[in-house]
Amino acid sequence: MRVLVLGSGVIGTASAYYLARQGFEVTVVDRQPAVAMETSFANAGQISPGYASPWAAPGVPLKAIKWLLERHAPLAIKLTGDVDQYLWMAQMLRNCTASRYAVNKERMVRLSEYSRDCLDELRAETGINYENRSLGTTQLFRTQAQVDAAAKDIAVLEQSGVPYELLDRDGIARVEPALAGVKDILAGALRLPNDQTGDCQLFTTKLADMALKLGVEFRFGQDIQRLDFAGDRINGVWIDGKLETADRYVLALGSYSPQMLKPLGIKAPVYPLKGYSLTVPITNADMAPTSTILDETYKVAITRFDNRIRVGGMAEIAGFDLSLNPRRRETLEMIVNDLYPRGGDLSQASFWTGLRPATPDGTPIVGATGFRNLFLNTGHGTLGWTMACGSGRLLADLIARKKPQISAEGLDISRYGNSREVAKHGQSAPAHQQ
């Protein structure tokens, strides 16, 4: 059985790898010249199941108003006049209740924990190396209010059986020695010892190499134009003016997925959350992070690779704008100077931006659609790296009609209700354009 995977980020590549392991004949198509050239290229490097939390949370609407007035705010909104942007934000606001937050976080943690286990298994089986470390994540709180607010997250961690450790200032210095000199500006921390780190782009490149050995074909530099459909089936995909056919189709196009799906009557509430990162060469290893920290105030992660520090975070709801905002670089540099002032050379840092495909409830869309041979793997937001292996393996099981190792409840697009209006026979308009 032939499967056509659209998109070669970490999600599409993981999907292809696990499908090939199930015995499918897999082809991956992407407009870029190689895998992981867009959102997966320079993310924060964290694999953090315990910190899998939706942006839609109690108190966020009021915080968002406050953040609009702050120079170094973790969230910024640039209204584009796009109806989809307004609808997405309205849906996000509806998910900012305590009850919805608990449901959404459970789904995200469930998939993230499974994904971490899949990654562990993959690493044990293959020896894949991607500058990975398994030294945990430390979430830094600058105020006592942040420490107190962590109680609701700890309750979910306990319910999910995720190990954690609350740290005082001395505890922070113990797990991250380079922070000893600045511990007085911190109020405490929450550490998840089972979290991991690694270079997502490097991982995706090596996973693609392993997929090639399993027979997966990668076709780069090709324009994915539209889906051809009739009734409840996909007939093929128009790629560079030619109709390509398969038995099953997987859409893993990140923020560009809705453009492809809308003509089919599928309303996928995925919208880009623009994020930024700096990659900083290490000049003093003793003054650099040991693993990864998450600054709760600014929603920024600082992660240690072999000889580099990756600083990433923030979110702009600004449509498909990929321009580099110098104020965001200023914020990232400010946080590095605040916490690790002697760790790396900021003058040699590379600045990057990417569009994370976010759903309004934070949970990705993984699974079947109203079309019998079309499957989705998209909407992972800031957690694509964390959820990649689990999402790929889960989807492969679903396509193979095998019972997944975790519950898939609440993960597919049906949770949004009428996800497909009645689609007329015909072809879609062009999509997947930047």
UniProtKB/Swiss-Prot annotation:
NCBIfam families: PRK00711.1 (NF001933)
Entry-linked InterPro entries: DadA, FAD-dep_OxRdtase, FAD/NAD-bd_sf
Pfam family of the protein (one): DAO
Keywords: FAD, Flavoprotein, Oxidoreductase
Entry keyword Zinc: no
Pathway(s) annotated for this protein in UniProt: Amino-acid degradation; D-alanine degradation; NH(3) and pyruvate from D-alanine: step 1/1
Protein name listed in UniProt: D-amino acid dehydrogenase
A cellular-component GO term for this protein: cytoplasm
Reported cofactor(s): FAD
GO biological process entries: D-alanine catabolic process
EC number: 1.4.99.-
Physiological role: Oxidative deamination of D-amino acids.
Binding site for FAD: 3-17
Annotated gene: dadA
Family note: Belongs to the DadA oxidoreductase family.
Catalytic activity: a D-alpha-amino acid + A + H2O = a 2-oxocarboxylate + AH2 + NH4(+)
Keyword Transport: no
Superkingdom, taxonomy of origin: Bacteria
